[in-house]
A protein has these predicted regions:
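N-terminal Sec-pathway targeting helices
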Residues: 1-14
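Basic, polyanion-binding surface patches
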Residues: 8, 19-20, 24-241
């Protein structure tokens, strides 16, 4: 009789453990299904209610960055570029693609360096001006009243009035067709102290970045979710691969 009671207690304990920890055995796919609470589709054509447009740039939004460089005579220049992105993590590299017709293309080739000046929405007039006119015809700093500052680590100017700056040394470039993609290693990042949180991140409550798409500029980004709050950590790790 005593053995029977012990056996029942052991079985009850096993059942309790399975009930408490059974969810831990979920695969990432199972976790994702529970996350969205919708049945996963077995097949999808990917064309339902969509119109084929052929080859067309529908990437939106794109960052509106102002690229700083010196020409061969040492004149500071800036231009607005949206064909920009992060190219690598370690070492941290960014890329910007420019047409050979642009003045900045030749400036970067001459100096082997450039800066990335990240604008706030309050600076949109300067962003538009830098993207509309060529440095061949004028000194854009003189025309706009912006202040060029010689970078500490690379041979390129940055814009004092812009809140975030990346100093980049040119490490390689690739001719892709209409554009040359410049890859720059970031050797220093600068930010206005008022925008810096204690954890070293940008305070997005105080910073209103500019994005570009379809010939227009936009601002007013709004936080909708934190990735670590919306996706289980184990699944999150898999999504990053």
């Amino acid at each position: 009789m005593q053995k029977s009671k012990i056996l029942n207690i052991v079985l009850a304990g096993i059942i309790l453990i399975l009930l408490l920890f059974g969810k831990g055995s979920l695969t990432p796919a199972d976790s994702i299904k529970q996350l969205f609470n919708t049945p996963a589709a077995d097949t999808a054509t990917g064309t339902q209610n969509k119109r084929s447009l052929g080859v067309k740039n529908l990437v939106f939004p794109e960052p509106a960055m102002v690229i700083g460089s010196y020409d061969k005579d040492g004149k500071p220049n800036i231009m607005t570029a949206a064909w920009f992105g992060v190219a690598n993590s370690r070492p941290f590299k960014v890329s910007v693609s420019l047409r050979p017709a642009t003045y900045s293309y030749h400036c970067i080739m001459a100096s082997q360096a450039f800066t990335v000046n990240v604008p706030d929405a309050s600076l949109i007039s300067y962003v538009k001006f830098a993207g509309k006119y060529s440095g061949r015809d004028m000194n854009k700093f003189t025309e706009t009243g912006l202040t060029p500052v010689r970078s500490e680590y690379v041979d390129a100017p940055y814009v004092k009035e812009f809140p975030i700056v990346l100093e980049c040394k040119l490490t390689e470039y690739h001719d892709l067709g209409s554009h040359r993609q410049f890859i720059g290693e970031v050797v220093d990042a600068k930010i206005d102290e008022r925008l810096l949180r204690e954890d070293g991140k940008v305070n997005m409550d105080l910073f209103d970045p500019v994005v570009y798409g379809q010939g227009e500029y936009y601002s007013g980004l709004e936080l909708i979710e934190n990735i670590n709050e919306i996706v289980p950590e184990k699944v999150n790790e898999g999504l990053r691969e």
